Amino acid sequence: MATTHLDVCAVVPAAGFGRRMQTECPKQYLSIGNQTILEHSVHALLAHPRVKRVVIAISPGDSRFAQLPLANHPQITVVDGGEERADSVLAGLKAAGDAQWVLVHDAARPCLHQDDLARLLALSETSRTGGILAAPVRDTMKRAETGKNAIAHTVDRNGLWHALTPQFFPRELLHDCLTRALNEGATITDEASALEYCGFHPQLVEGRADNIKVTRPEDLALAEFYLTRTIHQENT
């Protein structure tokens, strides 16, 4: 069984563009304060002592990353990402060395709290399949009629969770599940869905709902608020 002293490698797929942000700059390179969103996301991972290395998968044509101080960080490895998220994660896993467990974290999710990360990492003591940070659905959920912006019915929210990141799995298991799912044409929306496809049932670790992913323009101000609040709390 895995123990807490095992080093962890994190993989950050950062090859996407994010057209919903309505900006020419990829969202991970937008700034909050004096750092990019990507830097906030990566530094939150490196703040935990078990995370010894972060592999960042960037677009082969990316000229922005090399301009960041992060590019010269001794714990950072950069690889070329792929067309899809799963391709980028696989590229990152190949560069993860002999790490037995890996975290996968969104490049545009800068508000990760250390207590959430610590509880997720504790799964290596109790689980053989790992798990994800997630938040219970609290809003009323509606399913739309096919092809229409009209309500078909209300979805029972009991047992529904919002999947967050990081997601935390044994490296070899995640590699094998992603490879099989891609080879068989399965729809993979996050890393956990690859394990689900292969018959595994990752754990849900309840995380904070303010661990948001910056996807739309209005998310940027919200992420800035959350980060500013966290910094203020840490300094008081």
Curated annotation (Swiss-Prot):
Signal peptide: none annotated. One of its GO terms (molecular function) is 2-C-methyl-D-erythritol 4-phosphate cytidylyltransferase activity. The record marks 20, 27 as: Transition state stabilizer. Its EC number is 2.7.7.60. Keywords: Isoprene biosynthesis, Nucleotidyltransferase, Transferase. GO terms for biological process: isopentenyl diphosphate biosynthetic process, methylerythritol 4-phosphate pathway. Coiled coil: none annotated. It is an enzyme of class 2 (transferase). The record marks 157, 213 as: Positions MEP for the nucleophilic attack. Pathway: Isoprenoid biosynthesis; isopentenyl diphosphate biosynthesis via DXP pathway; isopentenyl diphosphate from 1-deoxy-D-xylulose 5-phosphate: step 2/6. InterPro entries: IspD, IspD/TarI, IspD/TarI_cytidylyltransf_bact, ISPD_synthase_CS, Nucleotide-diphossugar_trans. Homodimer. Catalyzes the formation of 4-diphosphocytidyl-2-C-methyl-D-erythritol from CTP and 2-C-methyl-D-erythritol 4-phosphate (MEP). PANTHER family: 2-C-METHYL-D-ERYTHRITOL 4-PHOSPHATE CYTIDYLYLTRANSFERASE, CHLOROPLASTIC (PTHR32125:SF4). Belongs to the IspD/TarI cytidylyltransferase family. IspD subfamily. This is 2-C-methyl-D-erythritol 4-phosphate cytidylyltransferase. It comes from Escherichia coli O127:H6 (strain E2348/69 / EPEC). The lineage of its organism: Bacteria, Pseudomonadati, Pseudomonadota, Gammaproteobacteria, Enterobacterales. The gene is ispD.
